[in-house]
Structures are given as structure tokens and as C-alpha cells.
Amino acid sequence: MDKRYTDSEYLFKNFLLSKLNLKATYLDIPDNNCFYLCISEIIKNLSLNIEKNINDYSNALIKNFYNCLIKDSLFREKQPAVYGALLSKLKDFLDSNKISKKELFGFLLDVRKRNSLSYFRMVFSEVESILSKETINNIDYSISIFNTFLNEIIARGTDIRFLNFSLSEMDTNPAFDKFINYVKYIAEVNPYNKDVLDILVPIKIDEEKDMFIEICDKRNQKYEIIDDTIYCKIYDRNTNDFFTLIEDQMVRISSIFDLIKLYTYHTPEFDSELPIKIKSKILNKEFEIPFNYIIRFTGNKPYSKHLYNTITSLDAAKETDIKFYHQVLNTLSYAEKDLSRKNSNAFVDNWIALETICSISEIKSGYEAVQFFVPKILITTIVRQNITSYLIKAYKNYFKDVKLEDFLKIITSENYEETLNKIPNTYNKYILLNWAKILNNPLNLYQYINRLQDKINIDILRIYILRNEYVHSCNLNAFQTLEFYKLKNIFNIVIDEFFRCLTNRKDKDESHEGIGFDIFNQFTYKWDIMLKSLNLMFKVEEHIYKSDTTKIVPDRTNMTIKLEGNLTYSDYLLNLLKNNNEILKKYIPKKDYKQKDEDLGILENDFINIFTDI
């Protein structure tokens, strides 16, 4: 451990390094579930349909907020009156519609006005309290508070790219000689934590420079000329987040470009070849950032190893289904625009690409197709990605490389906790121990998969709402960087899985439903097999999982696990299914077991392919 930090500070630092990595796996991207964002998105949605008795997204958003509040022990303890009243109102609306949309809207508006700032300060104080201790008393609670704190910061408008940039200053800048100073910097908790920023944004204009300068003067847009290049000046003392500040001001500067384009044949634009110059009072330095850091998304890409197989399969598909072929080309054309358009436009293009690829399934509504298929496509991949990423971080440079198969062998041994406790990094160890608890118990895994499905669905809904606001209301401020990172992460996995299924089609001839039907049928079949297998491993009645998590369960010591040869994720779960058949029968109602027994052979043949690392 870095001796500059206490145990609690080191935990928070590594939490941030994982969450703010711009190439993080889907499960590491901040989930946005916090008081300020949840209440604000409900208020906004209710305001659009407050007098109309129509089906909208309110119920899904309210249910998500309710579930978040149930887990918020800090809010419950520190502000019990507000917490209880808020929970009661949401429950009344969800369960029985005892209150109208209008009444709920007014109530939530008042709660946000009175309590949003006090809630944030309460969370910040709790973070301060945790960080003030040398040791970590309760790691689960600490991580939960850190999550809430980070989500609140992002929900209040701080760009994740700025937070990522700030990590590079944490260890080296004298302004953050005390770790709490860094925390105050990203949180902007008090006026004295606000920076003074001088920013120069380069402009490319070959002619009509005089006209541009004249318009700048009339619109009170400051500028400087350095080495014959015009720079528009941005000055601000109300924020630390220069990414958001620059993006906001670029909209204003672009209006000057538009005026010149409208009245002349000249096309001024931002000069992406030159860097943006920034001077920060808090950081006490002048520095430059590449222009593309502001206007381009940088993050994960689909796996390049699939490229050549995809090209071959796509060419073969062209011979049998020309409609399918053109749908795929349309998808790729929208996704590719990401490289040539600024983030807000690319956000919409990437949603169109996702809708287009999912609509190949023949579900008419693009949004409904995305909601139905994306969770089924994502879950096994994001679980595998997340575990693998933490294995790399936990073991690289410490011990030998540990792969997913090795990890599963470790967690099925009786002393797995002792083995994992040797991991030096507390946060990485915490994540892998949590995965061990989930994977070691079929019920835990089943419940986790259902929670994960809910998480993906609420992310998709938020992305869709932002897309609609941007497209239909022309609200340029609707774009949020964090949602774009999630959308890109989702799309990359979907396109990978789609082309992998296309490549692996056993029957290369056109089926009577079409190639697209074949591919999406594979996704739903795999999903059904996975859930049915987990049901057989533990219980059959799905509602029991959802309504009661305190049922007596088979003791882990009574579960036989035989490990032979190279173990994969699916082998591990399949061994549970095969070797505990008699034990599992006791937990399956007799009237249902005959049908389940008939399915067992199918499950054993197909389940092996679900979780394997591709």
C-alpha cells in the first residue's frame, strides 16, 4: 500500500481509479443511482405528462428510486422524517395510486428544493468521517457511501472526463498534499473550493477574420491572437470542471460560426489540430489538452479479433438475405460516425445503431427490441469482463497471472477466503470476494442476474429519455457524457455478440424466418437455458427468488463439486447441476419435477456454451 495514504484513503483512491477509468468495464461505470439524479429525472418526466393519464416512464423511474432509498441506510439514519415521508409517498403511488401525478410532482419538487443540498452535505460529511479514520471499520458500508458520493457529484453536472483528469493530479499536485483537499476539489462543497479558470480555444478561419473579430466584440466574446491563430477566451470562477465549461461555451461560440456561414461562403470552425490552453488557480499551473478530448469520445472498442471472421460471415450472408445485409451495413455506418462527429451527435447515432441492430430481430419498435434483447446479450459477457479485469489488476505484478478458470478453482476450495485475502489491494480483494460469494451459490447468482437485468433496463431507459430530449426538444444540454460511455459500452458488446453468433451459425443456409431471426433466437435460447439451469440448481418457483430471500437453502457443505481437467465458468455451474441432482430434487416441487427431469439432458448439452470465455 502507498504509505502516503491511510487504509481508508487508499480504498477510496482505488475505488475512484476503477470507477473513473474511461475504458472501464460496464459494471464499473458509475450507476447514477443517487438522491439528486433519481428525484430530478422523476420530476422532469412527471412534468411532461402531469395532466395526462397516459403510459409514460414514471413508474419505472419511481420504482428504481424506491429501491435505491431502501438501501440508503445513511439517509434513513440521519434524516428519518424526510426519508420516511418520501418512501411512503413513492409506495402510495406505485402500489395503489392513492396520490395523483400532480400531487407527487409537487411533493418531490418541494423535497428536492429543501433537501438536495443538505443530502449532499450529509454524504460528504460521512465521506470525511470515513477518510479521517486510519483503518476501515466496515468496507461494505464505506464502498456504499463512496458510490453515493461519486454518483451525486456526477448527477450535479460534473463530467466524468474531468474526474478522470483529476486523478492524474492526485499524487503529484501540491494542492492535494492532504487527500481530503482532493475530495473537496472534485466535490466543490464550498465556494472556496471553486477554481478560477482561464481557457483559450483555437479557431480555424482562413478568411473574414475581421468579420469574426467584429462579431466577437459585439457579442462580448473575448479573444486572443497567438502566432496568427485566433483563440476564443473562456473565463470562469464558478466551477472546477473545465470539460463541461468548455463544451457549454463551445455552443455559444458555434453560434458565431453559424452567423458567418449563413451570410458568407466562409466556414470558420474549431481547430482540432491545436491544443486547448488552460490556466488553473487551484492547480497552480498552465497546461494543454488535445482538442479531441473535448469533442470526441475515447473508450472501449469492439474486439478486433472478430473483424476478419465478421467480414467473411457478412459476405456469406449477403448471398442469402440481402435485406439483412443492408440492415447490418446501416448499423455500421451509424456507429462509424462516432469518429467524425462531436459527442452529442454521435450519442444519437450510436443509439440509432443499437436500435437498428436489435430491430433485425423483427420486433417492430426499436426501443422495445433493445429493452428485450440487450440484457440477454450483455449479462454473461459483462460478468466475465468484470471478473477478468479485477483478476488482472489484483494479480498482475504481485503473483502469477490468474485467469478466470483459475479463479473458479480457487473459490470452490474450502479455504478460498484465505487465498483471496493475500491480494494486497483492498478494493480489488473486496470485489473478488464479492464475486466468490455470488458464484459459490446458485441462489446468489440467480438473484444477482435479476438485479443486473434491472440495472441494464434502467440504463437503457435513461439513455432513451436523453436521446428523445436531444432529438425531439432540441435540448443540447440533454447530452451527458456518462450515458454516452454506457451506450458505447453496451453497443460494443452487442455488436461483438451479434457478429460472433453470425460467424458461428451452424446452418449457413437461410432459414424460413431469416438470418436475423436465427441470431436473436440464439440469444433468447441461451438466456432461457441459463435461468432454467439456475432454477434447477436451487428452486423452481421464480417468484420465491423475487419475494423471499430468507428461505432455508441447501447448505453449501452438502453440495458436491467435482473438478476435473480445465475448469471454465460454465463447467463450474454445470458440475453443480449434475452432481447435486438428488439434493436439488428436495427443493423442487414433486408435481413439477418430471418436466424438469426431462429437460435435464438438454441443459447439460447446452449450458456448457453459455459462460465460456470467447
Stretch-by-stretch model annotation:
Residues 1-61, 303-548, 569, 573-584, ...:
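Amphipathic, oligomerization/interface secondary-structure segments
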Residues 1-158, 163:
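N-terminal "leader" segments that precede or initiate the main folded domain
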Residues 92-345, 352, 356, 482-513, ...:
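Charged, non-catalytic interaction/linker regions at domain boundaries
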Residues 554, 561-563:
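Short linear proline/tyrosine/threonine-rich motifs used for host-factor recruitment
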Residues 567, 597:
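Functional cation/ligand-contacting sites centered on basic and imidazole/sulfhydryl donors
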Residues 586-589:
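Surface-exposed interfaces of beta-sheet-rich extracellular modules
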Residues 593-595:
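Short alpha-helix capping/helix-loop boundary micro-motifs
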Residues 598-602:
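Short, polar loop/linker segments at the starts of domains and inter-domain junctions
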